[in-house]
Regions:
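Short, structured beta-strand/loop micro-motifs enriched in basic residues and often containing a Trp
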Residues: 1-9
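Feature captures the catalytic cores and cofactor-binding loops of soluble hydro-lyases/lyases
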Residues: 31-32, 36-159
Length: 186
């Protein structure tokens, strides 16, 4: 099913999304990769606040290239999500609900998604220039020393994504693999 949604990703909205849905996302998202996630989780462990309010937030696993003159951002394709798996349950426990990336997730992340009504969106790897066209504003908000991995606040319009894992733990990757194997056996 095709859905056009406006953030923030509330629990109610998350529960309307199902593995396999095509989603066009509009609203504010945040960028972070493994170094940024590590730093945020360290801050949380010390009782410190995060650089943004994580409640109902969606985090895009991306390290964008520098913007060319006249552009908001450079190429902004997804990075492999597995590198954030050690941190994703902690981020969801403080309110983050959406994650955008590519690739499979560990069972612990899927369990956290079920517990906290999280959604994992897949973005097309190799389509960073196309995805960058959906980004209308970009603002560096923290950890500038991390370069491309610094935290940014982005405003996106109609960002094309697929729900890979929904809040019930349904997993498009696993469903697709099972369907393929079933056909192969016939």
């Amino acid at each position: 099913m095709e859905k056009h949604i406006t953030l923030p990703l509330t629990e109610e909205l998350a529960k309307t999304l199902h593995a396999g849905d095509t989603v066009y996302l509009t609203g504010t998202i945040y960028t972070s990769r493994d170094a940024g996630h590590k730093r945020m989780c360290e801050a949380l462990a010390k009782g410190e606040e995060l650089p943004f309010d994580p409640k109902n937030a969606t985090i895009y696993y991306v390290g964008p290239t520098p913007a060319k003159p006249g552009h908001v951002i450079g190429s902004a394709g997804p990075t492999t999500s597995g590198r954030m798996d050690a941190y994703a349950p902690t981020m969801m426990s403080v309110g983050a609900r959406g994650m955008i990336g590519k690739g499979a997730r560990l069972p612990e992340v899927v369990e956290a998604m079920k517990k906290y009504s999280g959604v994992y969106f897949g973005a097309i790897g190799g389509a960073g220039a196309l995805l960058a066209k959906c980004i209308k504003k970009a603002e560096l908000i923290a950890y500038e020393d991390l370069g491309a991995e610094a935290l940014r606040r982005l405003y996106v319009e109609e960002m094309p994504l697929v729900v890979v894992i929904d809040s019930e733990g349904n997993n498009l990757y696993e469903e697709g693999r099972a369907a393929y194997l079933q056909k192969k056996e016939k």
